[in-house]
Amino acid sequence: MHMSWTQQHLSRRRALTAATGMVAGALLPHGAAHAAASTYTNPVIWQDFADIDVIRVGDTYYASASTMHYSPGAPVLRSYDLVHWEIAGHSVPVLDFGAKYDLNGSRGYVRGIWASSLAYRPSNRTFYWLGQIDFTRTYVYTATAVEGPWNRLTTIGTPYYDAGLLVDTDDSLYVAYGNTTISVAQLSPDGRNQVRTQQVFTTPSSVGTLEGSRFYKINGQYYIFLTRPANGQYVLKSSSGPFGPYTMRQVLLDLRGPIPGGGVPHQGGLVQTQSGAWYYLAFVDAYPGGRVPALAPVTWTSDGWPVVQLVDGAWGTSYPSPAVPSPPRQVTPMTGVDTFDGTTLKPNWEWNHNPDNAKWSVGNGLTLRTATVTNDLYWARNTLTRRIQGPTSTATVQLDHSAMRDGDRAGLALLRDSSAWIGVTRDGGVTRVVMVTGLTMDTNWNTTGTGYEVASAPVPGGPVWLRATADIRPGAPRPGTFSYSTDGTTFTRLGPAFSMGNDWRFFMGYRFALFNHATQALGGAVRVTRFELSTP
């Protein structure tokens, strides 16, 4: 089911090395009165959440997104108003899909969790996540609460590429999937097996590629909502049942988006509010930060076709807020301080590939014991990441480095296929704070550069504070800068600005990343006593 790189202008997710992203976040300051906000501003979440699926269960909205090589995968976002979002959990607790996701002999960069689907089944009050991995098979995970626990229900031999799961009004389960040729599968009543699949639509050559299926039944009609990567959205409609025949209509094409320098809103899904209004939660290409969710109201023609409501011919930067009941509580902001108390990581965090769980712990800070001996950060296990908040944000880490050993490297990175970091190195008993740049990959995601030091300074034995500031406004490469402090108050800039590229091909955007790896021998450790993600 993979396609060649020569067709990338038609579909930007067509090779083994290509894929898709996620959805979540809060835009307005925490504590802003929901009732007082008569309008909202796009993007509703300025963080990297692509390939969104969105549903409502009662008075709560949930969204799912791609995560590729990050673990746990497939975050579930929660909102009470479609505007303010939090991360509630992850549908895929561990990337249990082969050794490469453990960085064991091979690597899973830009593989893993691509566009997938989230649904709720009222008959058994269960959430379902369904997605294909590595074009080999489809996995289904279920939970009775989005926080988890999520458990694998089944694997299905057909890889449902870009799947949309529909729970029909008679409780039947259907999956729409495919690239250009769109198919519909019916699952067994228990959701464990495929009982039927057939092609239902072939995309006209004049349109090119359609993928990213979302599957709906609305007023007795069946709809498959499809994207033309990365500048269009189309919809198929059938009045004859889930297997068609379907007719196609364009929803949007080359529509001006709400973010200066960003792309066309596309993909994502439709959701209906309690009062019957409809909204489209799409994403906007906004590199170097990734793909960020944008929300627009939708109306319907008399003959049952969706129409996105525009502002001056474009996807609005602002719209009237959805009319929804007062939220039962404020959502947890996606920025702020984490002191790593308790027994688990908060769901805002995702590891680069699966972690070695014997080598980290939380409670009284985050302890990272070295898990890998390598000079290549891209091979190092237990690198812990957070999405960057746009348009600009700063990550500050308080680091206890007293248990580092010779050869260890620990710090704070701006992580993507071209990376840089500020951190503490210990060599020959000497501890320094350094900036390293030149960590690079090729387009097959193999390491081409392990980095080189561009600045350094001595540090005393006490804690050190490391800071990275990232500008992720789209449309051009943007600067990331690093600084450090020995008292937590006065910060000193270290090294030149790092240019974060805005090419889309890694799919996932830049992230802040905490790391600690050995270059000589295991046994060292660091403790992160405080992390803060802040905006100007």
What residue ranges belong to the model's regions?
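N-terminal secretory signal peptides
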Residues: 1-10, 18-30, 34
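Extracellular glycan-recognition regions
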Residues: 296, 304-306, 310-536
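Structural motif
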Residues: 72-73, 137-139, 183-186, 232-236, ...
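Hydrophobic core segments of beta-strands in well-ordered, beta-rich domains
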Residues: 55-70, 77, 108, 113-133, ...
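Conserved Ser/Thr-centered positions that define the repeating blades of beta-propeller domains
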Residues: 79, 142-143, 187, 236-240, ...
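Blade-edge beta-strand/turn elements of extracellular beta-propeller
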Residues: 38-44, 85-93, 100-105, 141-158, ...
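Beta-propeller domains
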Residues: 65-92
